[in-house]
Amino acid sequence: MYKRQARTTRTYAAGLALMQFIWVVWALLGQPGGSGLLVALLLLEVFVPPLAERHGATPWHPEHMAERYSLMTIIVLGEVLLSTTGAISVILDEGTLSGQLIMTVIGGLLIVFCLWWFYFKHSHAQRLEEDGARPAFVWGYGHYLLYAAIAAVGAGLGVCIDVLEHVAHVSSRAATLSLGVPVAVALVLMGFLHARDVASWEWAVRAGGTAGAVLIVALAGWEPGLSVLLIGLVLVASLVLYLVGTDPSLAEQPHGPTDRLTSAEAPNG
């Protein structure tokens, strides 16, 4: 066991040291190759851990890893709220609040809260513990794309607000697509990150259907405020339908926990 782990750690050390050397040389040479070489070097570096783990998995803590990634997700979602509220505060200072802006704020809040719920609806720690280290790389690297998609949601909300304030000169369809596309991508990625058995793959399909509905709203070309609100309502509807369809207790316990009392436990008189 320890021999395998020793080989793994040596591969880690050699691979990461080599990549650091390449990064330094690339920087000293004036970053030749531009963005293309940058992406290639990034891919090489993220390939080092999977290559090293082929010799034997190092000890790791699934719950801790899930917590770290989850906290980063919350931070990115918080940045979306921060950017939106910052833009709205400027508008309030200028005294130009309108119905479209109010719908944008409400829709933006619904989108953020629903994305939070979609991400935390399953236990990531349980999946990591049951699947092992190798699938965890796919799960972990998949978060890179998820973080980018969530950050793009904040940018899309900013574009919609700028269009309503006549700061950004793009069409309503372009503005809502700048929001709808990253929301749809985030939904698909969350469905993929959760998918590990039949039940969760069903959820992944549901997430894909919700993403399709979001894109339809974005393509409709309505005013940005209305579109943002409708996208938020689409997510809420998907959430409610999921809860009603998968949680029988919502219908089976209309009178609270006292319905489960047996005759022996029921109070006399």
Regions found by a protein language model. Give the residues of each.
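Signature aromatic-anchored transmembrane alpha helix within multi-pass, membrane-resident enzymes
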Residues: 229-235
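Accessible peptide chain termini
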Residues: 1-3, 268-269
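Hydrophobic alpha-helical transmembrane segments of integral membrane proteins
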Residues: 222-229
